[in-house]
């Protein structure tokens, strides 16, 4: 299983390489790492996934803003491990996350991990509504 740890400055380029929009949001990734809001999953030193947990970002609740796993590491428990680590590191009793309607693997992961639907937002990505979920940290 991949090692989970806080992202370091030297991880930024590897994180950006996993994110399909990584180069377009390089400054955002750098800020997340600088603010200690980014976890990475590493396998034999290679960054294979990352997650950004923004404390108090969503109506004063923690929000998982970005979660990406490198394509060849998907469906191997990396995303699940990152999500569980985010809950362990949460600073609020309830954590929120959102994903596009088209992202069935993420929606299935969230449901299997006990995340509850909170609502649907339209108008963010044309034709692909955003599903919002929450997890009560105290519930495990």
Where on the chain are the PLM-derived regions?
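Conserved catalytic-core motifs of GNAT/GCN5-like acyltransferases
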Residues: 96-98, 114-132
